[in-house]
Amino acid sequence: MNLMNPEFAMPDVQSTVDTRQMPIQRVGVRAVRHPLTVRTAEGETQATVGTWNLDVHLPADQKGTHMSRFVALLEERGGPLTADAFRTMLATMLEKLEARAGRIEVSFPYFVNKTAPVSGVRSLLDYEVTLTGDVRDGLTRVFAKVLVPVTSLCPCSKKISQYGAHNQRSHVTIDAELAADVPVEDLIRIAEEEASCELWGLLKRPDEKFVTERAYENPKFVEDLVRDVARRLDADERIVAYVLEAENFESIHNHSAYALIERDKRRGA
């Protein structure tokens, strides 16, 4: 039997008509691990591994989508994944899947080679990054989300104590809708500069002295942290909207302190 002969063509069940007349808002593949490259702030490329979610809108009369085409899209993609490249990838997906709406999300670890503040020793620090692209009603939107670990030191603890103050590791999460390409490191830098102190992968004793004193001289409540980062995001014209979170893993409690600011600059809110 020659399966390539039209006389023996294999049936394509997914392309048949569905009589239930129920559209599906999102259908596709999730948790696909696939390599990618991203561009650093210095213009170089960094190789990493992404966990991808891809989906499209399915009309009411169509039984199924073309599942294999999602993975084929990842296989064909090349070059660093910038905001512009992400928009192109979204358009290509809609064309391949014959869809009018769709969404791509990829999460990956991103590494920054940081220099210790006193000794100058260099070490890598990892950050969690998620890029999301969404096409709906003819509008394409691209989001960059990054989780930045930092140090926070309590102003109240410092004020009431004769010496010392409680401090802890904190997470600043910036989820920004982009009007233009924004390097991941720009968002990281904003969060780190507004914290009591940033983190490093490797520190020598002179560096530990520096970060201890730096945090002590720059105390911040979780409210201070989220407001100071928000002020920086407000001033950045490349960002049109954001959801900003700060969470302090309190060293003197068994719970966290948390704050959130959400703003869409297009609405002036």
UniProtKB/Swiss-Prot annotation:
Signal peptide: none annotated. GO terms for molecular function: GTP cyclohydrolase I activity. The record marks C154 as: May be catalytically important. It holds the Pfam family GCHY-1. Its EC number is 3.5.4.16. It catalyses: GTP + H2O = 7,8-dihydroneopterin 3'-triphosphate + formate + H(+). It is an enzyme of class 3 (hydrolase). It comes from the Bacteria. GO terms for biological process: tetrahydrofolate biosynthetic process. Keywords: Hydrolase. Pathway: Cofactor biosynthesis; 7,8-dihydroneopterin triphosphate biosynthesis; 7,8-dihydroneopterin triphosphate from GTP: step 1/1. PANTHER family: GTP CYCLOHYDROLASE MPTA. Converts GTP to 7,8-dihydroneopterin triphosphate. Belongs to the GTP cyclohydrolase IV family. This is GTP cyclohydrolase FolE2. It comes from Burkholderia pseudomallei (strain K96243). The lineage of its organism: Bacteria, Pseudomonadati, Pseudomonadota, Betaproteobacteria, Burkholderiales. The gene is folE2.
